[in-house]
Regions:
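Edge beta-strand at a domain terminus
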Residues: 109-126
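N-terminal intrinsically disordered, cationic/polar leader segments
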Residues: 1-63, 68-101, 105, 114
Length: 126
């Protein structure tokens, strides 16, 4: 599958990346996994029952739920403790395309930033 990930921070587009990876759909979850440009295995797990998202990289996992949650997550700056809160998850499908839009807040002391991931999965078999 072709996977295109666009990252926005406070509504400003900051990254646009394309990868080949896997997209798995089950009754209770959807999973997107790929190897990023730094050769790190990334897993994005969308739990349909809990309405939550987790992003795994380098044996670290960021859990994003509607209630504010703390996680230790590997970033370009090293391992950081991040407080996150899910704002919204949207899913749109058309023909051989699936787009997930995940909007969440990251809190830094008294400040917060809003991140948005647009994940477009294209079934290359069509």
């Amino acid at each position: 599958m072709e996977i295109k990930i666009t990252t926005y921070v406070d509504n400003e587009k900051v990254h646009d990346e394309k990868y080949v990876g896997e997209y798995i759909v089950e009754n209770t979850y959807e999973k997107i996994q790929y190897i990023d440009k730094n050769e790190k295995k990334i897993k994005i797990f969308i739990d349909k029952m809990k309405e939550s998202v987790s992003i795994e990289k380098d044996n670290s996992k960021m859990s994003i739920e509607y209630s504010r949650k703390s996680s230790e997550y590997t970033t370009v700056y090293g391992i950081m403790k991040l407080d996150t809160q899910l704002v919204k998850i949207n899913k749109l499908t058309r023909n051989n395309l699936v787009m997930h839009e995940i909007i969440y807040n990251i809190f830094f002391d008294q400040e917060k930033q809003q991140n948005k991931l647009k994940i477009l999965v294209k079934n290359s078999g069509n």
